[in-house]
Amino acid sequence: KATQGANGRWSFTPAGDWADGQYTLTVKVEDEAGNIRQSAPLTVTVDTQTAIDGIELVNDHGISGDNLTNALRPEFRVTTPGDVNTVRLSLDGDTNWVNATKNAAGVWEYNWPGDVGEGKHTLTVEATDAAGNTATRTLEFTIDTTLSVPVITLDSADDSGNRGDNVTSVRSPGFTIENIDPDANRVTVQIAHDGSSREVELTQTGGRWHFTPDSAWTDGSYTLTVKVEDNAGNIRYSTPLDVKVDTHTSINRIELVNDNGVPDDNLTNEMRPQFRVTVPEDVTVVRLSLDGSGDWVNATAGATKGEWNYSWSSDVGEGKHVLTVEVTDAAGNTATKTLDFRIDTRLSEPVITLNSADDTGVPGDGLTSRAQPSFTLQGIDADVVRVTVSVEHGGRTETFDVLQGAGGWIFTPAAAWTDGSYTLKVTVEDEAGNIRHSAPLDVKVDTQTAIDRIELVNDSG
């Protein structure tokens, strides 16, 4: 019931506190004559409080909702009741407040215009509604832009070639990953090989980060890159590591360079043999041993890649020998191959004689009346591969190849010789390239004689 004051005004005050909400008030008046009138209804809203429903770090990178970001200029979103008309923010107790802006969806937003330093921060948000009520709420957040660059290396035990060359003969090599920060939440290794790539997620074991392929790699080149991500969403990549897997090597060829005589028969008349070894270009060491002696000598790389040479520094004896070659490549792989060869420096000196049947003069005087005399060749070794007879006559020399017949080594001119002097010499060559010459044989062909004159000595008349 309303009451009239001393000034004649009527007023109404509730006897008790009203709860928040909407109220409709209507005034009813009645005079002494019994007339009654009612006012138009008055709707009143009682609003004694407001709230801040949520504060969100918009650029919360990494793990969602952990209020950890790597953005130096954080962005915030504030959710409030619809009747809030002012939202302002303050950082780390600063008395300088900034006003958020309400978007079309009724959410308040603010992007910090300047860089906020690394570390922990406290955001204070104050909201004011249409009734003048205020509410305050804080948000703890952290800015972290720091993450170390990881490093990946081939395990020294698997670096089987020259130390640090990242060439290995191990098909499942191990790799050590270092410089991983404690707040890293994901570590992966990206492996590129032969035009394709894959990513493997790692787990820290025994306080260390390590990677070993789960299956054997084929020979070839591999590029490994470590990717690290922390709780704040920072990402770092290691410098790519190029690794070559090489699990075998070979010896392509062993050549006896001074192979005289028949080519490639590995027979020589040189007491100091020379060898050429052809190998893959990644071979770094070539060594040789003779007849299983266990004494090794190192070959020297030639001007042509993949060719190695060695000339024996002292005489090697006559006969058969076995050369053993061992090679080692950059990955530490080894290969062994042998070459059987023979040294032969001996060859008998041939002898040529005029056949006795054609020695028509005094035996052994080298004088014959035969225009096509035959000659016997002796002292011809079994390993001889070529026999020639050179015939010099009248300032001209001709050479003829001789073949062994059923009757032995015989040389007979193919055409009749004219009368005159002839010098014959035999040359023999064996499989090892040894050459010997006979002593010259001088022969005179005289196929006719004459009676120049008959004289009666005691012709006295």
Give the residues covered by each predicted segment.
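Flexible, low-complexity linkers/stalks enriched in Thr/Pro that connect modular domains
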Residues: 37-60, 137-155, 237-259, 337-355, ...
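Aromatic/hydrophobic beta-strand junction motif of beta-rich domains
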Residues: 74-80, 173-179, 273-279, 373-379
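Short proline/glycine-enriched turn/loop motifs at strand-loop junctions of beta-rich domains
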Residues: 80-85, 179-185, 279-284, 380-385
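Surface-exposed, short loops/turns at beta-strand junctions within beta-sandwich domains
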Residues: 15-22, 112-120, 213-221, 312-320, ...
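Short, solvent-exposed loop/linker segments at the N-terminal edge
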Residues: 62-72, 160-171, 261-271, 360-371, ...
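Short strand-edge motifs at loop-to-beta-strand transitions and within beta-strands
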Residues: 8-12, 106-110, 207-211, 306-310, ...
